């Protein structure tokens, strides 16, 4: 067991800095009591209290974060290998950890350990160069044909597989040099993006794979450098390598599961899912699907005060919308009988007791590491009192069941956490059968074990709870899943906290849980995002254990544009219209112009739009004075109305204040002039006005990208602008909710649920990426 550090934080920062951690990493480490204690012990074992080489120190730090808890008796040996430079390094350290985890209960076979983990194996630069040369010669014809479009990553992977203990940097440098020698520097053709395939390819997954029915492909080539997320290559252990307290536990588990991967997505039904949950779904469902396993949708419904059927239904709908298919929908509440019996068994084994302290007394005791005065009751007394709790003989808060861990433990989660509390509330699934409900810390791990979960994947804030998770399962003698934590998804310009979202809704800062300015999946759906776009974001960012990483909202928008570009039918809309009269076009004439549904996909067909003597253009597409950077219309200037005719401005009509009210133009039906600037427009049948619709232009809800503690004062007052009477062409007629369009030169829009038979309503999903350049040209 780790001991509590006996030196203060400043001294710890100094100690950790002496082994090579930078100051910020050293300070961050001291905030994690378990990691800090582990690292302090390892430094002592290594004899590095006065410092060491940075390369050694970083290996010791990695050891503190990753060393398997079941193999503590071998830790000092591995520390000695590192401290005395016995050929354990960053290349083979993970192999060492994996070996010790598998053989934790055995005496260390040094020869087998060193052979299995590459200890003492040295791959020279010359060996790397020879392996690269052999590969290049073997694949020379393909390389010469495809040049820099050849999968260079495949070369690196194959060389690494053949030279397992080689330095990855050496491999990369030798491959780069060999490719340059064979092909020479990149030409302009080499730098061009590869041709798009006829059918989209499945994105390369990092520890997961997209579970939606379709995918948009790999975004890597088009992501700007400043938006590229840091991915980590994650390799989870096989179910058969999951060390248990007894071989029988593992054998029984493997017999039940057939050795397959079993994961779960376990939301609490106390609100609507947000985009952070999309990442959790993507990892859990995707990892199981990729490996031929299964994933449960499990509701952790242990708090009846905050849960209701509306949230359950919404969560099921969101999971299906994202394309995930749970093997079964389960509820922690369906295990209440089993959990109750396990609690009694916990009492019988001396690991739980009924406590009557108040919440503040419990908090103080855990902080000061002092025992509850009720901690040493007899088993018989605790069993009777727990039964009295179940029978409703206590008021809420007057009695709780606590797990008897270790009140002196440096990890606060081991200090007698609550297992059961009294709540006289109706439960959406179990009704009024129970008045005692298990806590998350008690329920989560036990239901994982009951459902034979192989990989319990949680966000990093639960890392501190891993010790309690394993402890509770072990003292009850149950099967123990692998627990692995990853960084949660953080997104700029928005909040993902359920508490904060509730505040926004209740204070009517937004219009409900599906307001398009929120981060809920319902909100993104209403805003027009597709499940494929959200899954593409999850696939693009992958998984990482680096906490505090925030993903730019722009990357999400990039994923959305990438997906909608090939799906959204084009239409034209004018938000701030100027009337344009084509003076040489017959007054009573109307015609229909053919326009492509999706210009890049001719197979998607065309649609017809009305054209007559009166058309409308955007006010921002006209200027009294022209310049070379302006794409729009000006006096005496000729431009092209997209898909229609060239027009030339002959006359400008203004009101008393100088505001332009009407333009008179002439058109060239033969479009004699070529390569003119092009603008969008809207018209209608002669003698009628174009269709009108309400358009809602959404911006970020918060002014700053990083949302601080003063978040309510950071609300963007201009996060919603409504265009009540925009002109839109007839393409959108007969549309239904969630139908998506690209309004040409403007952005992507979706039909909102507020649409009626009298008036359509559109929400802006995302602007076109060229909007920034366009706005510059109009200034």
From Swiss-Prot:
Cellular component annotations (GO), alphabetically ordered: cytoplasm; cytosol
Superkingdom field: Eukaryota
Keyword field contains Coiled coil: no
Gene Ontology MF terms in the entry: ATP binding; glutamine-tRNA ligase activity
Protein name in UniProt: Probable glutamine--tRNA ligase
Entry-linked Gene3D superfamilies: 1.10.10.2420, Glutaminyl-tRNA synthetase, non-specific RNA binding region part 1, domain 1 (1.10.8.1290), HUPs (3.40.50.620), Ribosomal Protein L25, Chain P (2.40.240.10)
Positions that bind L-glutamine: 300, 440
Pfam families, per database record: tRNA-synt_1c, tRNA-synt_1c_C, tRNA-synt_1c_C2, tRNA_synt_1c_R1, tRNA_synt_1c_R2
Record-listed E.C. numbers: 6.1.1.18
Similarity annotation: Belongs to the class-I aminoacyl-tRNA synthetase family.
Entry's Gene Ontology BP terms: glutaminyl-tRNA aminoacylation
Name of the top EC class for this enzyme: ligase
Stored NCBIfam families: glnS
Binding site for ATP: 268-270, 274-280, 459, 488-489, 496-498
Keyword Isomerase: no
PANTHER family named in the record: GLUTAMINE--TRNA LIGASE (PTHR43097:SF4), GLUTAMINE-TRNA LIGASE (PTHR43097)
UniProt keyword terms in alphabetical order: Aminoacyl-tRNA synthetase, ATP-binding, Ligase, Nucleotide-binding, Protein biosynthesis
Catalyzed reactions: tRNA(Gln) + L-glutamine + ATP = L-glutaminyl-tRNA(Gln) + AMP + diphosphate
